[in-house]
């Protein structure tokens, strides 16, 4: 597999590596460079393309250009923390359906607040690389399933069981 390394014109801290034939793109947002590299390397080894950002503000600057399939967010970061970043991503119609995962200490507060703003998954640090990969793959599969259902609904091809509950069709 040929791998090309590219430099972007985005802020200096952003990292992007083009992986021909990549099975998906992940935007990794963490202020700790070592954690960003750890996540990046493990996801790239699984054939995923990874773009990194050092904080939530940088994430919001690049998300529309990067168009990731999944975003991982640390919680405690300078400028804009992960929970406020998640809330802003959910408020934007262009990013509201992107799968979001918090990769952090995952305190009770972080989990409760994350659920309130629409975070899809949580992974506590320190984590096993296999757990990270499994979580990202599951989020990507869920997103693909959501997109397929949305296209079926647009095309008017939604299948239903024909059973009725209160006069309304029941969808599987």
Model feature map: region roles:
Residues 1-25, 130-172:
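Non-catalytic signal-transmission and effector/linker regions of two-component phosphorelay proteins
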Residues 37-45:
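Charged docking surfaces used in two-component/phosphorelay signaling
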Residues 47-54, 62:
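Short hydrophobic/Thr-rich beta-strand motif most characteristic of the beta2 strand and flanking loop
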Residues 54-58, 69, 81-87:
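Acidic catalytic/metal-coordinating carboxylates
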Residues 66-72:
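Active-site beta3 strand of CheY-like receiver
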Residues 77:
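Receiver (REC) domain active-site loop signature in two-component systems and cognate sites
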Residues 84, 106-123, 130, 134-138:
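Alpha4 helix (beta4-alpha4-beta5 surface) of REC/receiver domains from two-component response regulators
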